[in-house]
Amino acid sequence: MKKYIDLNCDMGESFYERKVGNDELIMPFITSCNIACGFHGGDPETIIKTINLALSNNVKVGAHPSLYDLEGFGRRKLEVSHNEIRSLLIYQISTLIGITSFLGSKLHHVKVHGALYNMASLDDEIAKTIVKTIHDIDPNLKLYGPS
């Protein structure tokens, strides 16, 4: 049996003048990345640039959706309904699917970000909403979680 380790990293979290991370330096050393979808980081230019960078390094592209929290970088727990979570995920993941497709590739996975990630680890119903929404968008998308 062949063994494989996926080295994964959050990327594309800069937002216009607010620079976050060293994506260009890290990308050659990873096998998959989670690209911010615009709600905690990741403006349109950064998203496109980061997807292109991943593709040129043969790195699998994933969506990194969050609660709508630019000010708190997606780390603040916000009161949201399950329907709101579903809508946020549909919007952000679909955006990454569209851009990735436009650039000639396919979205590989989803890893939710920050507070949403933490909320899902503590609330089974939120976790179920996330899993069902991702499956409804594309049953072939992988869901990345804590190891």
How would you name each of these model-derived features?
Residues 24-28, 49-62, 101-104:
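Acidic (Asp/Glu)-rich catalytic clusters
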Residues 35-40, 119-120, 137-147:
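Catalytic beta/alpha-barrel core
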Residues 5-9, 33-35, 61-65, 108-112, ...:
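Hydrophobic faces of well-ordered beta-strands that scaffold small-molecule active sites
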